[in-house]
Amino acid sequence: KMKFVNHHVAHALSSYYVSGYDHSNIVSLDGYGGSESGILAIGEGDELRVVKSVPNRNSWGHLYSEITRMLGFKSHSDEGKVMGLAAYGQHDEKEFTFIDWDRDIPLIDKKGFKKYLSGLTQRKKGEELNQRHKNLAATVQHTLEKATLQMSSYLYNMTGSKNLCVSGGCALN
């Protein structure tokens, strides 16, 4: 029997069912998937309960892909290069002023993000990577990690469970 499920439910279940846990907190994040870019869920036995949805306008995968593009790499393909480059830079907590951290799910102000991007100069093909590029990579990597930890903490505070499954395109980063 075949059953069709929501994009992020599929991501969540794919990590939960192979985890070996009989209960777990689950964070699924990527660029887009239907009407949302992620979910926060709880797996218990064979059941999955979605407790929060991350709307497309607040896509952490889109944020990462756009920075990938500005760094002169191919978005939706070269995000792993940005993750690797991040190790050579220093993140700047004050760089991304368009994020509201005072929520269960940190909120990306889409207009603020567009304005931020318009102030960047895209790295040209063949242009050498400089420290600014490395720092930007470190900042986007740190920001994604911080956001994922904040969402994971929200689930932990809800359930008390230390079990965590992370899935979706952002999980690699």
PLM feature spans:
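Short acidic/glycine-rich loops and adjacent helix/strand connectors
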Residues: 1-173
